[in-house]
Amino acid sequence: MSEIPPEVDLLVLGAGAGGMTAALTAAVLGLRVLLIEKTELVGGTSARAAGSVWVPNSRHSPPGEDSFEKALTYLQQAVGNRLDTDRATAFLHTAPEMVDFLEDNAAVRFRAYPYHPDYLAVLEGATLRGRVLEPVPFDAAVLGPRFRDLRPPLPEFMLFGGMMVDRTDIGHLMGATRKISSFRHAIRLLARYGTDRLRHRRGARLVMGNALVGRLYHSLLQRNVPVLLSTQVTSITLDDGRVTGAIVKRGAATSEIRARAGIVLATGGFSRHPDLRRRLLPASLDESSPVVESATADGFHLAERVGGHLAEHDSNSFWAPVSRRRRADGSMAVFPHFVLDRGKPGALAIDPAGRRFVNEATSYHLFGEALFATLSTFPQGTCHLICDDTFIEKYGLGMVRPRRMNLRAAIGDGYVVTAKTLDDLARRLHVPADALSGTVARHNRFAETGKDEEFGKGEDAYQRHLGDPAHGPNPCIGPIAKPPLYALGIHPGDIGASAGLACDASARVRDTNGAPIDGLYACGNDMESIMAGRYPGPGITLGPAMTFGFIAARHAHRTLRRGKGEAGGSS
């Protein structure tokens, strides 16, 4: 579509998972929708993410194992008195409905991980499985030429320059020389990828976040929902206190569009806005973020001009340990260490004094918090992940693949430091040799007994899930013994905003007095997270993003159907 219509029912800003869910829901409900994306690609940070969606008590949960009450208890335990009970209740009630609605009316398909504990597995209300959904792999060839509109994942999460793999695929690839079933799976993957590259710039079999946004985008195209790329809203229009439309800029042209039911803000949050980063995030944080570069607080600025305001937390973002490496084109790769290395047996995280500072198998958010605490003591220092040759052969390390596939290049460009002895490694890392030797010796004793006497690594279900089930006595603790030894620098990285626009349970943006602004909604990282800076499980950003996008669209539909500006009720 090349022209901006003069009027729609609902205008959605931002084509990530939250925005596309809002647009798709509105279209299914019969509204005239326009989806605007300021970049030339759809998907946002969702396209780079793992694609996990935290939805308790959905149709994919094992029967009888979960409930609204159990999930609410868990959130109350995990978030504490910071929990916005009204919005949390709306999320828990509506998230299963959102899944049903999308699967019944669109090309969106989910499946539950067979086993995936909540991150704070020892808390009351936590579950071992059923809450974490992932998108079913998607064949993007059905998009035809519109496949080019889809934002690719981070290059470091693809093999051979363009093949996406999920955890199941990785297991088969690593076991291809030991199991005939894994060998066959690997051959199918490679054959499919080779065929795809004859037609496309990358593999068309999409998994994780790319599969999720691919399915949402395909569903929008199937319903002929107009999606305008490289288009930006510069201001929101008001009439008697109600949002009525926006001024839209596309190329050199500017026009006004009326939005009868309102506007949904889903522009990605503030993670790439320099001034807000300095104001809201720790001073020790640099620009290490895998969030898309377009997340520059557009929704915040638009909302603030019409009365909205930012709600802050003691932790205004979500964290992960990241490593950095300069790409061949000069750009900086930022690799989040989520699940593939740090929780496996034989990885140690050390501070600039050569000592452990964290349970390596804890959640990536808590690991990030530990990095900040450590760097407050060593403001000019660098923390490292270290391992031995056995580890890197079996599990890889950061951007280094298992089997040492690209190890030589990583050593050559300085991403990985290697040494034959602990003393030599200490010298190369500028840490005290006696401290490092003592740290490794203690951890090697823990590997023998299976009990981490310092941090309790491997003592809950989530941590053991990150480990290697074939390793004992503790799946998360292994010795560092076989040279050469390896290390890479790790830093705290932000993976998405927690602070956001204050909203009510219907996803309506609130003004500074707490009243909803008629016709203005927010979801995703534009909305203040219901988790208030805590990270209870995988998918706690995408799950609420999609759910509140669904809530916003449904509320807008009901408002318009009533034919008046005041909804007067919940979603």
Residue ranges and their predicted role:
Residues 38-226, 346-349, 356, 362, ...:
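Conserved N-terminal/central alpha/beta ligand/cofactor-binding core
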Residues 235-243, 435-530, 534:
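A glycine-rich dinucleotide-binding beta-alpha-beta segment and adjacent secondary-structure elements
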Residues 121, 127-129, 134-184, 300-302, ...:
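An anion/pyrophosphate-binding glycine-rich loop and adjacent beta-alpha core
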Residues 302-309, 437, 544-564:
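Internal hydrophobic alpha-helix adjacent to the cofactor/substrate pocket in enzyme cavities
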Residues 4-18, 34:
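Beta1/beta-strand and adjacent pyrophosphate-binding region of the FAD-binding site
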Residues 220-234, 313:
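A conserved beta-strand/loop element that lines the FAD pocket in flavoprotein oxidoreductases
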Residues 1-10, 28, 210, 214, ...:
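Extreme N-terminal leader/targeting segments of oxidoreductases
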